[in-house]
Amino acid sequence: LESHLVDLPGGVWIDPCAGTGRIPRTVNAYRRDVRWILCEIDERHRETLSTIARPGDVLLPFGDFVHREWRHPVADVLIMNPPFSHALNFVRAAFERAAVVAMLQRSTWIAPARASFLRDHMPDVYALPKRPSFTSDGGTDATEYAWFVWPDGLKRRFGRTAMLDLPRQRNLFEASS
């Protein structure tokens, strides 16, 4: 997310589906003002996530983010790339746990199946002009992606739309000056 489009504050950030830690690793490379609460359902990622955590970060016991009892204060940012079929449940849970919610998801996430939710919770949408790779070999699929950002909480009927300009953009997680 270009820093001139979205100003993601420092502080406590949650990644509720941390997986192999790609989002926290990328953020940590550009920002020192973020402390993490990392959550993952798949225990196979425990060792990888423990190497990413810095002093002050919290690695939650492995389990389901959406249904777990939440005992932490509201975070500054919740940033995620949840499974497509569960994304709406993740977003709803995220609203209760963070001030700003940012989700990387297929562009088709804005669709009639979620119309009743989106009528009252319209995100800002930042389309990626290039397909991201989610594989170790750098390959991509035939799917377009976008960042969906709810910058100010729950209820709103309109959001902004922008195309990220990759050749000129600052890193998507770089703190704005």
Regions found by a protein language model. Name each.
Residues 1-177:
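Class I S-adenosyl-L-methionine-dependent methyltransferase catalytic core
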